[in-house]
UniProtKB/Swiss-Prot annotation:
One of its GO terms (biological process) is cell morphogenesis. Cell division inhibitor that blocks the formation of polar Z ring septums. Rapidly oscillates between the poles of the cell to destabilize FtsZ filaments that have formed before they mature into polar Z rings. Prevents FtsZ polymerization. The keyword Cell division applies. Pfam families: MinC_C, MinC_N. The keyword Cell division applies. It comes from Aeromonas hydrophila subsp. hydrophila (strain ATCC 7966 / DSM 30187 / BCRC 13018 / CCUG 14551 / JCM 1027 / KCTC 2358 / NCIMB 9240 / NCTC 8049). This is Probable septum site-determining protein MinC. The lineage of its organism: Bacteria, Pseudomonadati, Pseudomonadota, Gammaproteobacteria, Aeromonadales. Belongs to the MinC family. Interacts with MinD and FtsZ.
Amino acid sequence: MVERDNELKGTTFTISVLHISDGKPERIRQLLAAKVAQAPQFFNCAPLVINVERLTDIPDFEQLKELVESEDFVLVGITGAQSEAMKTAAKAAGLAVMASGKSRKAEPQPQPEPAPTPAPIVEVKAVPAPLVASKVHVGPVRSGQQLYAAGTSLVVLGSVSPGAEVIADDSIHIYGTLRGRAIAGAKGNPQARIYCQQLQAELLSIAGTFQLSDALPAGLIQQPVHVRLDNEQLRIDRIK
């Protein structure tokens, strides 16, 4: 039997960030509980990072950690710490101190290189990739029901009820009303899309980037829409 060495590799995850302006536990608990109530399965044991850049005083990170875990999230770290003392307190509570995703150092501009000598043109015949048929569900998806299209798209010829969940590794097409949760690009495909004839969703998610019902544009509720990722944010357009 061949033994494989342990490896340390870099990768990218989408993690929810909770921005707090004070350390009052009850307000934070109410916010997290409200989000979980909207999509309990989606947020169950979900990793969470707290942005503390608005805080002037050092919060009780041990208390915050217990509070977050009591609402079925997993607190993995903080971001936006303004002082070394705050970073030290977070580390003492077993939390990671993470840099803000928006701040990046300017990268040096590459110097132009001489144009390479053109390589000889070799004709390569394209080999078509094997097609994976979409998973088609005929009829409504009822509350508490979950459909998953592994490695392909999902087509629903009916409506998705509140409390129901439709998931696909590729795109989701709903020929009816979407009242439940739609999770496209479940394995990280940013090109996945969501289509529905009437939008009333509890949650929309593409490749880990999500939007809850309270953040949906009012003008697009009960409208036919097309959802896609645009610059790492969900963009919802009306289908004309």
